[in-house]
Amino acid sequence: MPESPSISAVRDLREATCGPIGTPEVTNELSENIILTSLDDLHNWARLSSLWPLLYGTACCFIEFAALLGSRFDFDRFGLVPRSSPRQADLLIVAGTVTMKMAPALVRLYEQMPEPKYVIAMGACTITGGMFSADSTTAVRGVDKLIPVDLYLPGCPPRPEAIFDAVIKLRKKVGDESLAERSKHQQTHRYFTMTHQMKAVEPQVTGAYLRAESQQAALAAAPAGQTLATDAAVLNPAPEMVQP
């Protein structure tokens, strides 16, 4: 019967096969135990690794964002923790159509967030008003007319992968900032693009042709000898049906 290997032989075999690199040696040199950096890099590294978003979803774009909270995309790996209070958040994600009635509430939430704070405009309806801006008189034509926007995420709606790309780009922006120069690059006015103006347009279909007064006026204004399609209906109404 062969003899069993000793404990030292088993340890040597384990180090040779399982850990070929070996255990790193601890050095006492000062240059190997100290990492030199700046206060800006340390501050930015802490902020970009713990962005706490405030989710402001008003339409279908938020459904795509809700998919990130599941296990398939793992939204938490970026250090993003959704918050329900604006005083605990430093990232505002606006997803969906913003109306005139909701605009004061959105501005109030943004003003309650502590500095430094960032805004992501998610979706076409948030950036330009989208398809609702053509006929609606209450849709805001771009959220940047209300609050400053740091990153635009187009799409109708954007995919979850696009949201990840936007978060990565925002992390790069946060990592390149400087505490001394941040106040110089902030927007001095809230309305970032063109002036938000609405022009009242008269409706094409007013329903006036359905009124009896309008029909009588049209008959009176018609030239002599010319009949209208409604002459017989107006002058000679249909007799009432008498039930036996």
UniProtKB/Swiss-Prot annotation:
Group of enzyme by EC: translocase
Cofactor or coenzyme needed: [4Fe-4S] cluster
Q: Please provide the record's keywords in A-Z order.
A: 4Fe-4S, Iron, Iron-sulfur, Membrane, Metal-binding, NAD, NADP, Plastoquinone, Quinone, Thylakoid, Translocase, Transport
Q: Which Gene3D superfamilies match?
A: 3.40.50.12280
GO biological process terms, semicolon-separated: aerobic respiration; electron transport coupled proton transport; photosynthesis, light reaction
How the cofactor is bound: the record states: Binds 1 [4Fe-4S] cluster.
S-S bridge residues? none
What is its quaternary makeup? NDH-1 can be composed of about 15 different subunits; different subcomplexes with different compositions have been identified which probably have different functions.
This chain belongs to the protein called NAD(P)H-quinone oxidoreductase subunit K
